[in-house]
């Protein structure tokens, strides 16, 4: 498995997608009652605390990533995004889709397809 380190000498070493997925899952966990693993200001919101925890490298990132995938499967057939909660067919389809996405992400992540050095926002190009 890949080493889930996000910052090496101040540079992001994972994809932005992975960082957003992990931070959003950890923020969700904090909002659901999990206790923070790092010192933080009283005024810090859960997304800020989540990013501080990810930066501290004290998390089990694989477990956090798979918790995010499970949450997507859980909510995919429960009335969100226009899907009827009465539809029994929605959940197996969503579960298969997420398993396919999860498999593809693992393959891409392990093959180093995700590379932040090749990605830039239009706003960033004018700053250089």
Curated annotation (Swiss-Prot):
Keywords: DNA-directed RNA polymerase, Nucleotidyltransferase, Transcription, Transferase
Pfam families: RNA_pol_Rpb6
EC number: 2.7.7.6
GO CC field: DNA-directed RNA polymerase complex
Catalytic reaction list: RNA(n) + a ribonucleoside 5'-triphosphate = RNA(n+1) + diphosphate
A single GO molecular function term of this UniProt record: DNA binding
GO biological process: DNA-templated transcription
NCBIfam families: rpoZ (TIGR00690)
Known partners and oligomeric status: The RNAP catalytic core consists of 2 alpha, 1 beta, 1 beta' and 1 omega subunit. When a sigma factor is associated with the core the holoenzyme is formed, which can initiate transcription.
Membership in a protein family: Belongs to the RNA polymerase subunit omega family.
Role, per record: Promotes RNA polymerase assembly. Latches the N- and C-terminal regions of the beta' subunit thereby facilitating its interaction with the beta and alpha subunits.
Annotated protein name in UniProt: DNA-directed RNA polymerase subunit omega
Source species: Neorickettsia sennetsu (strain ATCC VR-367 / Miyayama) (Ehrlichia sennetsu)
């Amino acid at each position: 498995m890949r080493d889930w380190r996000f910052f090496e000498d101040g540079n992001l070493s994972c994809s932005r997608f992975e960082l957003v997925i992990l931070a959003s899952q950890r923020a969700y966990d904090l909002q659901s009652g999990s206790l923070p693993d790092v010192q933080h200001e009283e005024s810090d919101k859960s997304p800020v605390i989540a990013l501080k925890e990810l930066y501290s490298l004290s998390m089990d990132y694989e477990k956090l990533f798979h918790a995010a995938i499970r949450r997507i499967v859980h909510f995919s057939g429960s009335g969100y995004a226009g899907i009827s909660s009465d539809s029994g067919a929605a959940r197996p389809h969503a579960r298969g889709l997420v398993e396919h996405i999860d498999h593809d992400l693992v393959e891409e992540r392990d093959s180093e397809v995700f590379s932040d050095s090749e990605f830039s926002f239009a706003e960033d190009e004018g700053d250089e």
